[in-house]
C-alpha cells in the first residue's frame, strides 16, 4: 500500500521500502528510563515506509491512513515547529541532523498495521522505520543502538513524550521467535529464544 500511495503522491517509484515491527513487553515496564532491565518481543504487525530522495531541501510526508500530506523545509524540522503525528517522522530527521543542512530532502509515505494507541509502540515503529531509511539514504552508517537513540530523541524532544528507548530497541533488534533482553543502563541488547507458538 505504501508503494502505491507513494506513486500517487510523487509520480515515480520510491528509492526503497523499509519496515519495523511494533512490540509487546513481557517484563520491565517503565524500567527503561530508570536504568533497569526489560524483555520485550517484536510482534507481527509492522510499519512500512516508502521513501524517495528530493533535491530541493523539502521533506514531504504522507500516509495510507489519511489524504493529508505535510510538506516543510528540512531545516524547519526542529522542536517546537512541528506538531501532530508528523512530529514522529520529522523528529527523527531532526535527530539525525537533517535540520543542520547538507542532507537531501525526502518524500516519505507511511503505512502501518500496528494498532495506534494500543500500547504496541506504533510511534516507535514509525520512528525506527524512518530512521533506518534515512540512515541508508543519507549514508550515515549508524548502528541499531544509535538509531534507537535517534528515535528516543525524536519522541522526547520533538513530540514531548518523556520515554526511554525500550520500544525503539525492541523494534530494531526484534527477530522472530526471540525476545530482546535489554540492559537499559548501558544500554545493551541481545536476543534470547522465546517461541510463543511452542
Give the location of each predicted region.
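Conserved hydrophobic/aromatic beta-strand scaffold that supports enzyme active sites
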Residues: 40, 48-50, 179-181
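Short Gly/aromatic-enriched secondary-structure transition segments
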Residues: 35-42
Amino acid at each position: 500500500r505504501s508503494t502505491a500511495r507513494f506513486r500517487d503522491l510523487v509520480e515515480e517509484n520510491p528509492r526503497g521500502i523499509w519496515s519495523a515491527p511494533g512490540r509487546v513487553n513481557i517484563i520491565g515496564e517503565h524500567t527503561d528510563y530508570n536504568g533497569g532491565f526489560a524483555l520485550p518481543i517484536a510482534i507481527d504487525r509492522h510499519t512500512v515506509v516508502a521513501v524517495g530522495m528530493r533535491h530541493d531541501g523539502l521533506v514531504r510526508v504522507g500516509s495510507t491512513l489519511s489524504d493529508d500530506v505535510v510538506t516543510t523545509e528540512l531545516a524547519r524540522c526542529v522542536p517546537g515547529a512541528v506538531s501532530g503525528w508528523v512530529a514522529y517522522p520529522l523528529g527523527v530527521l531532526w535527530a539525525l541532523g537533517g535540520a543542520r543542512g547538507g542532507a537531501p530532502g525526502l518524500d516519505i509515505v507511511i503505512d502501518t498495521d500496528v494498532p495506534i494507541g494500543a500500547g504496541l509502540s506504533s510511534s516507535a515503529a514509525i520512528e525506527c522505520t524512518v530512521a533506518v531509511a534515512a540512515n541508508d539514504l543519507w549514508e550515515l552508517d549508524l548502528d541499531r543502538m544509535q538509531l534507537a537513540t535517534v528515535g528516543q530523541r525524536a519522541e522526547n524532544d520533538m513530540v514531548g513524550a518523556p520515554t526511554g528507548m525500550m520500544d525503539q530497541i525492541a523494534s530494531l533488534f526484534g527477530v522472530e521467535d526471540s525476545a530482546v533482553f535489554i540492559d537499559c543502563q548501558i544500554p545493551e541488547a541481545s536476543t534470547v529464544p522465546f517461541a510463543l507458538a511452542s
